[in-house]
Amino acid sequence: DKLKILCVPANEGGCAYYRIIAPMKKLEELYGDRVEIRWNKNPLGINEKDGSWQQDWDFADMKWADIVFTQNLSNFGGNYTARIVGKAKEFGKFVHYDTDDLLTNIYEGHRLYNVYKEKGLEEITKFIYHHSDLVTVTQRKFAERVAPYCNPNSTLAVVKNSIDYNLPCWNMNKVPKPKKKYTRFGWVGGIHHEQDLKYFSGVPHFVNQRVGRENCRWDFFGHPPPNTPPDDWQHDVWRKYRDIILRGFKGGKNWDIHYAQTPDRYGQMFTMMDVALAPLEMNPFNDSKSEIKVAEAGRYKIPLVATNCG
């Protein structure tokens, strides 16, 4: 019989893509004769409109699986993720839980700091670690920080981030520069980097003064796409980003803000850069991040200027 794996991504964002969606699709592609995979972001049957539980839900996918694999905290909430683990154990399943952020130590200044404290999400994550059979994280220091919360009879392993360079977006031609002595700086970021950008906001003005704004350009990628509802909280994030970013610019415009790409098109953003930027505040949360930016920028042979953490 094939090994049956139920994959429960937290959402469809970049973290879920790199940590569960892409690797498990690759596993199925390479070993489809040995594994069978089902996908279900809502295996507990919560009503997605009002958050109520369906009383007659049969948990068919969970009962079918040998392994229940989930990651981070579901868009349905931390308690929902914990219940996935609890139900899987109730049905006698092997539970694999993956995280790519240090959710047990959110730093002050992180956009979700108050939410994590008010909803007890750090403690919920510790509970999930303790009740999972296999916990995977992205790097060694991360593993050392969460080891105290894991069950000593379970397995804690480092599974590094990787990129499928066979995807078309990682095999595109670079966008030509307008002239030879011209440098395009690029920043690609999600929606939790307000504190990190503060460490960078003065840099563009300094560089523009030294080399001349006509000889360089600054591109910021990740703005919510045009079809995002106007009341979506991501717009508020990028309004704050914009305020922070533009503090570093005086005079003529040599910057632009670009829409986010879906994870399977990330590579396209790096075709427009000559130097990639990844400023981070030094703290345990950021020091637990992976080297994924090296893999992204490196594919297009772009130097990466980053904080020495992680």
Regions found by a protein language model. Give the residues of each.
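N-terminal pre-catalytic "stem/leader" segment of glycosyltransferase-like enzymes
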Residues: 1-75
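Conserved catalytic-core segment of nucleotide-activated headgroup transferases in glycan assembly
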Residues: 11-26, 39, 164-266, 271
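Membrane-proximal helix-turn-helix segments that form the acceptor-binding/catalytic region
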Residues: 53-57, 63, 83-91, 115-135
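A short beta-strand/loop micro-motif in the catalytic core of glycosyltransferases
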Residues: 68-69, 96, 130-140
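An aromatic- and histidine-rich active-site surface loop
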Residues: 70-90, 104, 197-200
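Acceptor-binding helix/loop patch of EC 2.4 sugar-transfer enzymes
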Residues: 96-125, 166-170, 181
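Carbohydrate-associated surface elements
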Residues: 141, 162
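Nucleotide-sugar-dependent
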Residues: 192-195, 260-299, 305-310
